[in-house]
């Protein structure tokens, strides 16, 4: 099984906040045999979140 992680938060796009949740989630998914093939970080804009989600689910 494959997975993509989308981290949401404008603070994650600055050099002052690290996205440690994606690292933790990747490790936990790998333990379950799920391979993470892509990670995205997107700000708080609803339009940006929608576009990122669409990109993730389209073939």
Which residues does each PLM region occupy?
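Non-catalytic beta/alpha edge segments that cap or flank active sites
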Residues: 1-59
């Amino acid at each position: 099984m494959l997975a993509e992680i989308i981290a949401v938060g404008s603070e994650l796009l600055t050099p002052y906040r690290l996205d440690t949740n994606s690292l933790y989630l990747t490790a936990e998914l790998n333990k379950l045999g799920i391979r993470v093939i892509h990670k995205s970080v997107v700000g708080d804009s609803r339009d940006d979140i929608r576009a990122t989600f669409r990109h993730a689910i389209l073939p």
